[in-house]
Structures are given as C-alpha cells and as structure tokens.
Curated annotation (Swiss-Prot):
One of its GO terms (cellular component) is cytosolic small ribosomal subunit. GO terms for molecular function: RNA binding; structural constituent of ribosome. It comes from Fritillaria agrestis (Stinkbells). Gene3D superfamilies: 3.30.230.10. This is Small ribosomal subunit protein uS9. Belongs to the universal ribosomal protein uS9 family. Keywords: Cytoplasm, Ribonucleoprotein, Ribosomal protein.
Length: 145
C-alpha cells in the first residue's frame, strides 16, 4: 500500500552564480536556510532582504507551510537575493498547486508590484576576460614609439 504523497513543491532562485533551492511543504511555518532558522541569516544588514517576501505577504500566508532552503555558490549578497527569490517563487508555486488560483494571483501581484526580481531572475552574468588586456573590456596601453 502506497503512502499518501505530501503536498510539496520545489523551486529555485538564482543571482549571479548563487543558487537557492526551496522545498516547500505543508507544515507549521518553519523557514530554515541550510539547516538554521532564517532569523539567523548572515550578514545582519541583508537579513531583511531575505525577509522581504514574508514581510510583504504577511506571516499568515506562511503559517501553513514549512520551507527548507539549500543555498550554495556566489557571495553573501548574491545568496541572500537567491534565497528571497526562491522563497517567493516557492510560495507562488505552492498556492497554485494546492490552494486556489485567486489566492495565487493575489500573492503574485503583491510581489510583482513591489519588486520584479522576487519572481524573475536577473539575466546579467560576468563577462569573460579576453586577451590583450587585464579584464573583459580594458586593454593594455598602446604606444606609438
């Protein structure tokens, strides 16, 4: 006899080379990043960036779901931005799959009105270095004599 499937979705957020993967399932409102609570995310200055989806939508929308976030790659700032994007995308996906479409549209509109990067990844990437200079665009100084 098969066990009943748990209501869960998996979403990712990206910023530069940082990737955050969120497992969102029915629960009590716990949000953990790499095993520790989201309240302990470092650096403290950027902690509220990770909290933005929660503060925008209100804690009541997160009470019924648990989120486990694994983040790797990139720097501290990029990781925070990847975390906030994956939280927002996971909640929208959870609402679409297990709650009604009207609530999902409401959540998505609130997030889009505040900041589009909460749901849409930033496509900019670091340009590779070329020969003839120190970086991607700068060239070595040219001498005529």
């Amino acid at each position: 006899m098969a066990t009943p499937a748990t209501e869960s979705v998996q979403c990712f957020g990206r910023k530069k080379t940082a990737v955050a993967v969120t497992h969102c399932k029915r629960g009590r409102g716990l949000i953990k990043v790499n095993g520790s609570p989201i309240e302990l995310v470092k650096p403290e200055i950027l902690r509220y960036k990770a909290f933005e989806p929660i503060l925008l939508l209100g804690r009541h929308r997160f009470v019924g779901v648990d989120m486990r976030i694994r983040v790797r790659g990139g720097g501290k700032t990029s990781q925070i931005y990847a975390i906030r994007q994956s939280i927002a995308k996971a909640l929208v996906a959870y609402y679409q799959k297990y709650v009604d479409e009207q609530a999902k549209k409401e959540v998505k509109d609130i997030l889009m009105r505040y900041d589009r990067t909460l749901l849409v990844a930033d496509p900019r990437r670091c340009e590779p270095k070329k020969f003839g200079g120190r970086g991607a665009r700068s060239r070595f100084q040219k001498s005529y004599r």
